[in-house]
């Protein structure tokens, strides 16, 4: 379980946009929210690496991707991207790289809400 206060980079990769922000475990505040269009020739590994490189003291990454997840990897259905959680964790040097199918991440979101949200 990630330690309270550790820094997390949140990434959502869709067919046309990539959304990112940072958060801290135990807090519901989001920081540095960003949305950018991605082109067909974007190297997704390099793109994620460049986003992570500007963050200091980054401990974890949660990445939500449109496509089926099999064997810790997602092959996007509408882009020619393959994202492997073990390779990304090693490349970024973070404690954890959590790779989620986009619908799975929606389920976690709704499960974390309270009646007052």
Features from the language model and the residues they span:
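Short, flexible, glycine/charge-rich loop motifs used to bind or transfer phosphoryl groups or to couple energy/partner
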Residues: 1, 51-53, 87
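Short coil-to-helix leader/linker segments, especially the first N-terminal amphipathic alpha-helix
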Residues: 1, 42, 115-117
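Short glycine-rich, Thr/Ser-proximal phosphate-binding strand/loop in the N-terminal lobe
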Residues: 3-50
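Short beta-strand-loop/turn "lid" adjacent to the catalytic site in phosphate-handling enzymes
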Residues: 55-99, 104-116
